[in-house]
């Protein structure tokens, strides 16, 4: 930490956790081993930990403690304080708590259980999403001050700005493939190389996040219904008139109908391919307020035209099952299956919706790249998303699209294609 005294505070937290919680493991990591543990050096982290423990009243010190290089074992309860450095950071097994010397800029977006939050706006009450797709508690927020920054660009267009010492656990694919933990400034010097054939290749690939386990939410309509309405639905006149679905695909229509609430009727317009969603007529006749129209309003897509559509937050941050059903509704209507392994495409004239669908795919452990097709005739531009999902998820319900779609079995990764000083 760059703050005076923060290492001492971290030492106190580490001792408190391991002293009062049997079997816990607390880790410390830094770029050089001597910064973590160097015999007799007051600047090293482990010297401070030992000095802190030695200054405590005897009842707060372990009765039986073993001290070795980069390791302090509390033999009374089996807890451990361990140290790691350089490429070995993150390789020492699981930790209950880990302190690392790294930083992102304050304007970086961090995914939490409630959506994206700027790094500078994070609080101790936020829960951030880890690479395993689960929520993680924030144990401390520290202002690292001013430092030189690097801009890291990935093959899907994602850009991250971070400090030179920010740690990355990546797959190095040159020679024998291996997983390494490196700092930004180390990758900067060697992230690309030239093949014997003269082709520029990229050394580092980043594993994708596991499907995110957001909590299931109470939703006004089934996610598949919402996805299909966003794709082929008419909602621009809701609540003045009823929503409708337009499709020539009978399989889609049948599946859509099966996911409608019991209070909703689904009637085909005369000699057409559109279907109106109305309330089932009950004792109150048609004088009561339309529940299906209100449901569309509650979802948040009422009154939206094609280029204004988006995915409401409640659906975007619901459970894995709900997000997959939503994506399937979108893909069955406005998506296509690619013939190459595990690829699919989604088309929309809404930039906001394109960004939301991209997030949806990535939140399921997938990968998405976006291209913009400019329209020379004066119409709106089209955003095309190329999507790859993990093997356990199928982006379609429709059989005719699934018959074309081929499951991708190999690992999905993003390459680091550019690192620049900013």
What annotation goes with each model-predicted range?
Residues 1-107, 116, 123:
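Phosphate/NTP-binding elements of NTP-utilizing enzymes
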Residues 72-76, 277-280, 387:
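Active-site beta-strand termini and strand-to-loop segments that position acidic
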Residues 75-77, 113-115, 131-133, 155-156:
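Short strand-coil-strand connectors
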Residues 93-96, 163-164, 396-397:
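Short conserved micro-motifs at the rims of enzyme active sites and ligand-binding pockets
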Residues 105-118, 133-136:
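Conserved AWS/pre-SET-to-SET junction and N-terminal core of the SET lysine methyltransferase domain
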Residues 107-114, 128, 150-153, 385:
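A short beta-strand micro-motif
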Residues 120, 124-133, 140-378, 412-422:
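Intein-associated homing endonuclease modules of the LAGLIDADG/DOD-type, together
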Residues 380-412:
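Polar, glycine-rich mid-to-C-terminal structural blocks
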